A protein has these predicted regions:
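Active-site-flanking beta-strand signature of metal-NTP-handling nucleotidyl enzymes
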Residues: 4-11
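A generic structural motif
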Residues: 13-18, 61-64
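C-terminal binding/interaction regions
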Residues: 22
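Solvent-exposed alpha-helix faces
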Residues: 27-31, 38, 72
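Short catalytic/binding micro-motifs of nucleotide second-messenger systems
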Residues: 37-40, 81-82
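A short linear hydrophobic-aromatic micro-motif
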Residues: 39-45, 88-89
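Short, charge-patterned binding micro-sites
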Residues: 42-62
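C-terminal structural segments of small proteins and small subunits
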Residues: 61-101
Length: 101
């Protein structure tokens, strides 16, 4: 059995002044999440707002405990970069719980 962990990362950029600046910040963050943690990442909300963004990251693994620990590492890392401007929600499900056809 496999597990899927979804992390919804809500970000606030109070000092950012443009969509261009936001995109630059997000591009760097997404690349680092992919390199450091092997996460698949996409911007999933607030595309047209220059001070807010929501990213959704996915991690997949065979062991729920290891995946939880890995997700907690992602959360610590993101909160370390944005201590006052981030909130991370974590959801873990088994592939058996998904309605796959």
């Amino acid at each position: 059995m496999a597990y899927v962990c979804l992390l919804e990362i809500h970000l606030h950029f109070p000092h950012n002044g443009s969509l261009k600046g936001k995109r630059k910040e997000l591009s760097s963050l997404k690349s680092q999440l992919q390199r450091r943690f092997g996460a698949t990442v996409a911007e999933t909300d607030h595309h047209d707002l220059w001070q807010r963004s929501t990213l959704t990251a996915a991690l997949v693994g065979r062991h729920a405990r290891q995946l939880r620990d890995h997700a907690a590492g992602v959360e610590r890392w993101v909160l370390g970069i944005y201590p006052e401007g981030a909130r991370v929600e974590i959801r873990l499900v088994s592939t058996e719980d998904l309605d796959l056809e």
